[in-house]
Design a protein with these regions (language model features):
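Conserved short submotifs of the Hanks-type protein kinase catalytic core
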Residues: 117-127
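Conserved NTP-binding catalytic cores of kinases and kinase-like/nucleotidyltransferase enzymes
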Residues: 1-115, 241-246, 260, 368-377
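ATP-dependent phospho-/nucleotidyl transfer catalytic cores
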Residues: 125-147, 154-230, 339-347, 356-359, ...
Length: 377
């Protein structure tokens, strides 16, 4: 997408950002960030940067311009990917009222364009970690996410705007179902020999049971204590500012969800993003449990003292639900290859990840009677 930035508008934005309305604009440039959009409501990300002059002194500045694209298929405010949600989140002021340990980038301007796209002019943020996080850094970040979510159970008012998604995961599952022909529920789909070494012998029965009970898992998630969630909180969108504060970008999925879902979403995305990382994570229950313990510790720091099983259910159910997308795709891809020699190590690793996700869903099912039959803590 080609864009044309108005210098007159840019001057106003830079002056506002610098809190200096006498600044004069110097040289500047606008360059598209080398990033492939994974969301069809994002038309592009641009870095706009340059110098400004104040009393003959040069001041360097930079901004991020995010182009939001209208999408008919995501025009329902309760659709998980409602195209205008992030714009409304900034305009409403909700993102300026977050608990102290987390903040969104400052929004300098919202511009509606003649082509019906909307431009978000945002503060450029950086972190203090770098590209690769250590296990300890993951724990520190999820502790902050626990404090963020837990704050809404301990005095911070829960927003109720109509455009906040109240059933993000259920909407996502419904969208995924549009691309699933259900063939994986038939025994025939699993009969090719190469599948026998990739999955446990009882995988068909177990997956069918998951598919049968997933509606109950979603119902259980609705029973959990309700909190404000980012819903896309994982390393590319999180910028730690030390041990006690965090900047989160990309609030397009912000909504109301159950306690624990934030962590389940992070964990599921982590497994999906990098096979090397995922393969290591999926075979290390200590990492999973350390993340969960850190998240619960953050909730406790916020002041919530409820039953941790509710949190564990939120985590395992929301992460495990991802197997309903992953397994059908894998079986389809493997059936196309037929020959075991054509299967890559990556594909084999993804099969292990899929089984791990299914195991999480099964753990959630064991907790389900307590969740559906108990009182919210």
């Amino acid at each position: 997408m080609n864009i044309s930035v108005s210098e007159v508008k840019l001057i106003d934005i830079v002056q506002k950002m610098m809190s200096n309305y006498y600044l004069k604009l110097g040289k500047w440039s606008c360059s598209r960030i080398a990033w492939k959009a994974s969301n069809y409501v994002t038309g592009g990300l641009y870095r706009v940067a340059g110098t400004a002059w104040s009393n003959e002194e040069a001041v360097h500045w930079s901004l991020i311009l995010k182009v939001v694209v209208p999408a008919i298929q995501a025009d329902d405010p309760q659709h998980y990917n409602y195209w205008k949600r992030e714009v409304l989140a900034y305009q409403s002021g909700i993102l300026e009222q977050l608990p102290e340990m987390i903040r969104a980038p400052r929004c300098l301007a919202v511009e509606e364009q003649d082509d019906h796209t909307i431009w978000l002019w945002l503060e450029e943020v950086t972190d203090r970690i770098g590209a690769e996080w250590t296990g300890q850094q993951y724990e520190e970040v999820v502790r902050l996410l626990g404090r963020f979510n837990g704050a809404y159970l301990c005095g911070v008012p829960l927003p109720d705007e109509a455009w906040l998604c109240k059933g993000w995961l259920a909407s996502w599952v419904e969208e995924c179902d549009k691309y699933d022909d259900r063939s994986v529920l038939n025994e025939e789909a699993w009969e090719i020999p190469i599948l026998k070494g990739l999955f446990p012998t009882n995988i068909v029965r177990r997956y069918k049971e998951f598919y049968r009970t997933r509606g109950l898992l979603l119902k259980g998630l609705q029973r959990l204590p309700r909190v404000l969630t980012h819903n896309d909180a994982w390393p590319p969108n999180l910028f730690p500012q030390g041990k006690d504060s965090l900047i989160a970008i990309d609030w397009a999925f912000v909504g109301i969800a159950g306690l624990g879902e934030e962590l389940g979403r992070l964990y599921g995305l982590l497994l999906h993003s990098s096979v090397d990382t995922a393969a290591a994570v999926a075979t290390r229950n200590d990492f999973l449990n350390r993340l969960l313990d850190s998240y619960i510790a953050g909730i406790r720091e916020a002041g919530w003292d409820g039953d941790s099983d509710w949190v564990r259910f939120g985590f395992t159910a929301s992460a495990g639900m991802r197997c309903g997308m992953v397994i059908p795709k894998l079986i389809e891809q493997i059936n196309k290859k037929k020959d075991e020699e054509l299967l890559t190590d990556e594909m084999k690793a993804r099969c292990n990840i899929a089984v791990h996700l299914l195991e999480l869903a099964e753990e959630a099912s064991l907790l389900l009677p307590k969740i559906l039959g108990g009182r919210r803590s």
